[in-house]
A protein has these predicted regions:
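Conserved phosphate-binding elements of NTP-dependent enzyme cores
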Residues: 1-600
Length: 600
């Protein structure tokens, strides 16, 4: 578009050079600034610095000189989606210019409108892809397809609602239906009940996880699936099963809170907010409203600096008080528990330690002089010398994904022949690592220490998982639940602050119910749990709610409400409240006729 619309240029460059689209691309040698190769920044000892030649605009002088309505392409791309759409609507083009620009303008506006419709209006057009969440990146790719106008295409989306507030989920559903109505096929892998209810056809796979699943238990419309007794999803759709609103919420002690004052990291606008101790607090708000800036960049970093004594950079704020009540800090995220076969549920939960002790006490071990160390696949004495106890060999494929193949010597068992001669109730240490957690629970029913740890893994819904399953094969939700179970298995000391960022990502609603039981157990043991979440099933069970917004980006960053979920349902400015209201039998936006309970 810029290469085809006339512009006022001060120098004589364009008298000699033809204006082409590549002049406005920092990915092309024709347009990219030669000093920084189109990056806009130069590497330096103290980090990256703005390129002095292009001023961070990435382009050669010719590309920067062309302007429309006073903006060159780099300046235009600094606008967020909303601002860019408004700017385009202000452009005043002549009849000839409009003929030339009509098609590209239509495509630009279509894509911008879609990005806005799925809650990405707060993103700037030049935002780096490395800073985007998986859900944001997926919706941006979908925007490029919407603008293409293709028909007869099959689109496959894996949990497109990740990171989406219920308000934006509604928008996404409308967009997917729009794609369908153009003559395309949409296949979505999804756990969100609202998306499931809007499907034309539903395939429910199960009934359980791991080898307990893998079958199609129901197929048909959502209404038809509701009546399939074998479908857990159907039971939640019909209301036969559900996550209940607690009859009574934990009381908040105003004298025991972490108080954050003047938080202004990123788009936060001098936020003053309290996080009560000893309760389950959920932080809500549409995408980009400032939740991570408040909880992760400010609260979490400040707590980390106090607890660990490390020099941690904390988000901009005036003052934070109450951290003296926090003795431990734990972040439960979706990151893998390890990247090699050495990391597994047995090692991460530390249940392998007492299991090794049991094997060391067997008569065969005592006769051979074996100690607990003999049954560690990280120790040279007992492990397979060929694979060093990994059970697998790594084959690097360079341009393809690396491949792990079983060791020819031990056949994946990790240990040498002498170590495998020792058994407990007929099982070798390798056999134990090959057991599912539910099976291991039966095997070690007479061992209290082992049983307690295994029971917590079972309680979070991981009974199907093998004790020795490699950590790099877990989904994000599985990794998170292993971390939670490991925390639960520890002797309670209280005073721990747990921070979770969207823990329901990748979880079926039945798994969400299990997750909530675990979180509530942590709180009952004296800990404080702070969760960033969009899932209404989690939000409605919170003891305390902190809602930011009202929108994302520059339109957000304000504290809209803090208090109980019921009170939030009466807050007319809160998008979260509007979706909570029906759950409490209220009309959205109903004004509460009692004194203010924390709305800001």
């Amino acid at each position: 578009l810029l290469s085809e619309v006339p512009a006022d240029v001060d120098d004589d460059f364009f008298l000699e050079e033809e204006v082409t689209p590549r002049m406005f691309s920092f990915n092309s040698h024709v347009g990219a600034c030669p000093r920084c190769d189109g990056l806009g920044e130069l590497p330096g000892y103290h980090g990256e610095t703005k390129c002095p030649d292009c001023g961070g605009e990435r382009l050669k002088p010719g590309g920067r000189a062309v302007k429309i309505s006073g903006l060159n392409i780099s300046q235009f791309c600094r606008l967020n989606v909303c601002e860019a759409r408004a700017e385009l609507e202000l452009w005043r083009l002549t009849r000839n210019e409009r003929v030339i620009a009509e098609q590209p303008l239509r495509e630009i506006l279509t894509r911008l409108e879609f990005l806005e419709s799925v809650g990405l209006d707060y993103l700037t057009l030049d935002q780096r892809s490395t800073t985007l969440s998986g859900g944001e990146a997926q919706r941006i790719r979908l925007a490029s397809q919407i603008g293409s106008g293709l028909v007869g295409v099959m689109y496959v989306l894996d949990e497109p609602t990740i990171g989406l507030h219920p308000r934006d989920t509604d928008r996404l559903i409308r967009t997917l239906k729009r794609l369908r109505d153009l003559g395309n096929t949409i296949i979505v892998v999804e756990h969100d009940l609202e998306v499931i209810r809007q499907a034309d056809h539903l395939l429910d796979v199960g009934p359980g996880a791991g080898h307990y699943g893998g079958m199609v238990v129901a197929s048909g419309s959502p209404k038809q699936v509701e009546h399939k007794g074998s479908s857990i999803t159907g039971k939640y759709l019909s209301g036969k099963k559900g996550i209940q609103i607690p009859e009574e919420r934990r009381p908040v002690n105003s004298q025991r809170t972490i108080r954050v004052q003047g938080a202004s990291q990123h788009n936060l606008k001098e936020v003053d907010v309290e996080f009560p101790l000893g309760v389950l607090t959920v932080v809500t708000g549409v995408s980009g409203s400032g939740k991570s800036s408040l909880v992760v960049d400010t609260l979490l970093r400040a707590a980390e600096r106090r607890v660990s004594g490390k020099r941690v950079e904390v988000g901009t704020h005036r003052e934070i008080t109450g951290l003296e009540y926090v003795s431990q800090l734990m972040v439960i995220d979706h990151e893998p528990i390890g990247k090699t076969p050495r990391s597994n549920p047995a090692t991460y939960s530390k249940v392998l330690d007492p299991i090794r002790e049991v094997f060391a006490m067997m008569p065969e071990s005592k006769a051979r002089g074996f100690t607990k160390r003999r049954f560690s696949f990280n120790a040279a004495e007992g492990r397979c010398a060929t694979c060093d106890g990994q059970g697998y060999h790594l084959i690097e494929m360079h341009f393809l994904s690396d491949v792990w193949i079983p060791c020819d010597a031990c056949k994946g068992k990790r240990y040498n022949r002498e170590t495998l001669a020792v058994t407990y109730r007929g099982q070798t240490i390798a056999d134990v690592l090959g057991l599912e957690i539910s099976q291991a629970l039966e095997l070690f029913e007479a061992q209290p220490r082992i049983r307690r740890i295994l029971q917590t893994l079972q309680d979070v819904g991981l009974g199907y998982m093998k004790l020795g399953q490699a950590g790099h094969t877990f989904s994000g939700g599985e990794a998170q639940r292993i971390k939670l179970a490991s925390e639960l298995a520890k002797r309670s000391r209280g005073g721990t602050l747990y921070v979770l960022d969207e823990p329901t990502t990748g979880l079926h609603v039945d798994d969400v119910a299990r997750l909530l039981k675990v979180l509530n157990r942590l709180v009952d043991e004296g800990s404080t749990v702070v969760v960033i979440e969009h899932n209404p099933e989690v939000i409605k069970t919170a003891d305390w709610l902190v809602d930011l917004g009202p929108e994302g980006g520059v339109g957000g960053g304000r504290l809209l409400f803090s208090g109980t979920p019921e009170a939030c349902a009466h807050c007319p400015d809160s998008h979260t409240g509007q979706f909570l209201a029906p759950l409490f039998g209220m009309a959205p936006g109903t004004v509460l006729s009692v004194p203010d309970s924390g709305a800001a």
